[in-house]
Amino acid sequence: MSQLEKIYGVHAVQALLQHHPKRVKQIWLSEGRSEPRLETLLALAAENRVPVGQAERREMDAWVEGVHQGVVAEVSPSQVWGELMLEELLERTETPPLILVLDGVTDPHNLGACLRTADAAGATAVIVPKDKSATLTPVVRKVACGAAEVIPLVAVTNLARTLEKLQQRGLWVVGTAGEAEQEIYQQDLTGPLVMIMGAEGKGMRRLTREHCDFLVKLPMAGSVSSLNVSVATGVCLFEAVRQRQVKR
């Protein structure tokens, strides 16, 4: 059991049952928990012969950090994608890729929110550097509401080199920066695209910025100078979605 991970929350556990049921070894519900929104989860567990047990809520509180909603699953360790897997994914992609890069985002809540947004926008994958970045944790999975089990999260050793390879494949690299001259709404986002979001406060690293084909900014009309990275990610990705739908 020590090799198993614990994930929690209704959406995260249900998404894992839908997409990777063989990874789920045991599901625990808090004692007396019974409500309509658990019906799908329990049906999936029964279909995949995953045992479901009950535990005291205080015991479950000790298992995980965060609001578990009375649902905890023991699962085999998750797999973070590597660069070769990304290349294979791009080979199979029939529509213009839309890749999100998070450069130095270390907060797990922000990573989870960005994964959720990227999945909702139909992004091909999310790329993060292996160092100085948040990675998949139970908190990330909970915040992502199931998206962490669907969208590929690719951890790369050398982000600059990865960007070069993507450019060689014909993808355009667009970075977000507050000092950029062009607003995102003026940039063509309909082609094969890499969208880079930097860490809050610091922004993109110098080497990452140097590999951008274009820099864009979000117009800020109020007194604040920037948005939370997950909010900015949503604005940028869905502008790309909007442009692509208009072009059809």
From Swiss-Prot:
Enzyme Commission identifier(s): 2.1.1.185
UniProt-listed SUPFAM superfamilies: alpha/beta knot, L30e-like
Compartment(s) where it occurs, according to its Swiss-Prot or TrEMBL record: Cytoplasm
Major subcellular location class: cytoplasm
Domain of life per record: Bacteria
Similarity annotation: Belongs to the class IV-like SAM-binding methyltransferase superfamily. RNA methyltransferase TrmH family. RlmB subfamily.
Purpose: Specifically methylates the ribose of guanosine 2251 in 23S rRNA.
Name of the protein: 23S rRNA (guanosine-2'-O-)-methyltransferase RlmB
Primary gene name: rlmB
